[in-house]
Design a protein with these regions (language model features):
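N-terminal signal-anchor/first transmembrane alpha helix
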Residues: 1-34, 188
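Generic hydrophobic transmembrane alpha-helix motif, especially the helices
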Residues: 53, 57, 87-89, 97-160, ...
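Transmembrane alpha-helices
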Residues: 72-88, 123, 177-209, 256
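Non-cytoplasmic
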Residues: 124, 133-138, 142, 148-152, ...
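C-terminal transmembrane helix and the adjacent membrane-cytosol boundary/short C-terminal tail
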Residues: 144, 190, 194-200, 239-274
Length: 274
């Protein structure tokens, strides 16, 4: 599969963008010329120079340093959240497809209830109850979006349940746990990985949306969404303060989406031909 990915330009571009963002997130303290939260009002709205390569914001904070540290929040929250959602989706979704009509009906109705409300509204409500904090942001995103993951896994699982290899496994006396982990999950995993890879972008955008609205993170946190919010007052005089974090969000989301599309074309070629 790696060989096939390397033959696709969109996969290479996507992987390069993802790698750059991850390296920046890990090495932000090394690359940052200043403390991202250091306020220096005497340098307010300073123009780019050797000391401040991208200038400063309304409080004299180094824009480049804040952008570099912003990658830590976007990646550091989104990837663990996607891992948790993937585990929940795989376990609950496959259980729903295998456990019988009553359990399946209950889980389906529960998912429909959550999906009926916009994910952002649910997440905002959860943050309102739990308060600020990185853990609370992660919890709110999980609560707001778990139903989508369960639903998509259940859909894949139901399609597989009628196939011959599943029927053969049942006839041979395979119990539900063995059926799920040995037969069902390995066969739906390629499709699910495609869904997860494109879901990273949505998670990053949701986290940035919280910060833009002033939710979840303390004031002054160097996060891309928060930087967009802070720069609104300087929209016309210093538009670059909005362009920089907006571009970071766009590039990161585009990297994961490009990689997800390439992965889909390889693992699910039947959809690409439609």
């Amino acid at each position: 599969m790696i060989h096939k990915l390397l033959k696709r330009p969109q996969a290479i571009i996507g992987l390069c963008l993802i790698a750059i963002v991850i390296v920046i997130a890990i090495a932000a303290p090394v690359f940052s010329p200043h403390d991202p939260e250091l306020v220096n009002l005497s340098q307010k709205y300073a123009q780019p120079d050797a000391e401040y390569p991208l200038g400063t914001d309304q409080l004299g904070r180094c824009t480049l340093s804040r952008l570099l540290y912003g990658a830590r929040y976007s990646i550091g929250i989104s990837l663990p959240v996607l891992l948790i959602l993937s585990v929940i989706g795989l376990i609950v979704g496959t259980f729903s497809a295998c456990a019988g009509e009553k359990a399946d009906h209950f889980i389906t109705i529960l998912c429909d209830v959550f999906i009926a409300f916009p994910s952002l509204i649910i997440a905002i409500a959860v943050i309102g109850v739990l308060g600020n904090g990185l853990q609370n942001i992660a919890v709110s995103v999980v609560i707001a979006t778990w139903a989508w993951f369960v639903r998509i896994v259940r859909s894949y699982s139901v399609q597989e349940m009628g196939k011959d290899y599943i029927l053969a496994a049942r006839i041979s006396g395979c119990n539900t746990g063995k059926l799920v982990f040995r037969h069902l999950i390995p066969n739906i995993l390629p499709q699910f990985l495609v869904y997860v890879s494109t879901g990273v972008a949505s998670s990053i955008i949701m986290v940035s949306s919280f910060a833009f609205l002033g939710l979840g993170l303390p004031s002054g946190t160097p996060e891309w969404g928060a930087m967009l919010n802070d720069a609104r007052t300087a929209l016309y005089s210093h538009p670059e303060l909005l362009i920089y974090p907006g571009l970071c969000i766009f590039v990161t989301a585009a990297g994961f989406n490009l990689f997800g599309e390439a992965l889909r074309d390889i693992l699910m070629p039947e959809e690409d031909s439609l």
